Amino acid sequence: MLRMSLIVTAGLLAAAAGAVTRTPLIPASAKPASPPCPDVGLRLPAGFCATVFADNLGHPRHLVVAPNGVVYVNTWNYGGGGPVQKGGVLVALEDTTRDHRANVIERFGPTPGQGGRGGTGIALYKGALYVEERDRIERYALSEASIVPKGPPEVIVSGLPLSGDHPMHPFAIDADGVLYVDVASATNACQAHNRRARAPGITPCTELETRGGIWRYDANSTGQKFSPAERYATGIRNADGIAVAANGHGIYATQHGRDQLHDNWPALYGPEEEATQPAEELLHVRQGGDYGWPTCYFDEIQGRLVLAPEYGGDGGKALGPCADKLAPIASFPAHWAPNDVTIYTGQSFPPRYQGGAFIAFHGSWDRAPYPQGGYNVVFQPLGSGDATERSQCEVFADGFAGAVKDPGRAAHRPSGVAVAPDGALFVSDDSHGTIFRIGYRGGTEAAAGSFTPCPPVDAPAGATGTASEKPPEGVHANAGTAANLPVPPGSTRAAVALGDDVFHGRVGMAGCSGCHGSDAHGSPQGPNLLAPTLLWSDGSPEGLARTIREGVLLPRQFTLPMPAMGGAQLTPEQVSAVAAYLWALRQGAPGR
């Protein structure tokens, strides 16, 4: 592990993102000339350059950059998602050589062996580091002698709900010390049976008493307990990104729209609507505001909140109580998964970016059989008040996924964004543990008039027509080779081929590959189906069919459950076919 002696000052930043301030190791006047921009696989506007700041960090989620340039990252040890890094779940990184790559990397905090799970949320305030760890928000004092804290953390808030589909707790701290924390929903749409076909919504949705909103606490006080009384805003399904406004007061949040409209309600929604509805959202969060979940979802094509099918909706026409809910200030293509947002307050990017929002889109799983989307960083200008211009929405950084946009096979999945004191943008990836640094090298006007607009939402990007066609980007490991797979006893080659189609969403719209990966090797949404030992089945065709048919209604040896038939409505023939296909895939898997 590299260690450096650092010269420090005693000054503290007075703004909300304050932290220990240390003088740079190299004076600004001595800054070396920029080296040639390396090719790291990203597509950026003219004049921008991306470098790999660090890699192999595990599963980095959100990150912050201190005034001295030290990058702090929270990682998530969610289990079953690849190798667990040694050391603590928190990471401090520093570039003392000014080559835009961290040469000092230190881990701290609890290790996975000590029960450390990490999380998503992280922030700086008054010279201290605030982090999410399991059901708590903790505070570490930062000293002048080291980039990592030496003492134990203090507990700011404890008892945050951990169960269900969305256990993370992103948060932000404003200039007044108000800590805003997301307590996301435990379910997809507050159904009586989560993610099951035609399951009605619970009325009233009791989940909203303790979930589905943003809560408010005091960042200066320790020993606070989670309480329904501290709710700040409601009707927010999953605000994975929260950012303080440029003036230090008030917050913006991203909202993950609900899933499985066609899977659960095929009489009301077709496959195309599954891929294009509902929108992902950017909210300007107001105290006491109700943003509609679970009763409503935002139909981006119509530009309004409409009544959800679980609560009497008719496929997008009825409004009901949604007419009185608060709409987003900007919206984005369905299922892109906005995992973080930051407001650009740096000075090095062209003027177009000042005061706007950079949003990290983790990437979709719920658009099969059409191409998955997201896996990028989008810039959304913010005008005065809540005004935004959709036409100015920009796909700022793309190419993270590499050759295949698939949750289990993407090269990188953006999970966090943060602005550095020098104006650079840092992007974290929780798939392969990479931190990217994006800086601007051109003149201030070079990129002002040229950008890649966000795609339209009235049709799935890249859709080629019928659901029987292979998705253009979804060429999975066995595409076109089902005929060469072995056939289970008592089954047929036609059944294996049908199972291939059902698994990849071309028939039946189950979209199993969305959770388990297009190659069945798993993702954070679903376990590896080619492992030598399965979590939920004995691996026989009969056992596989039973698990598909009945589901796994409570989490078992994995962070998430599985609804019966993936939440779709499969025929007995289709269930048996998927089981036959998985059995056939497993015969050639390593360890067998």
Language-model-derived ranges and their functions:
Residues 104-125, 134-174, 201:
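Asp-box/WD-like beta-propeller blade repeats and closely related beta-sheet repeat scaffolds
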Residues 42, 146-148, 223-226, 250, ...:
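Periplasmic/extracellular electron-transfer cofactor-ligation site
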Residues 467-507, 592:
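Electrostatic cytochrome c docking/interface patches
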Residues 66-68, 124-126, 173-176, 243-248, ...:
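Residue-level detector of Asp-centered blade-edge/turn motifs that repeat once per structural unit
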Residues 107, 513-550, 561-569:
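Gly/Gly-Pro-rich "capping" loops immediately C-terminal to redox-active cysteine motifs
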Residues 423-425, 430-434, 440-444, 542, ...:
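C-terminal capping alpha-helices of c-type cytochrome domains
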Residues 70-74, 128-131, 178-182, 250-254, ...:
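Conserved beta-propeller blade signature
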Residues 21-43, 168, 185-227, 236-238, ...:
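Beta-propeller domain segments
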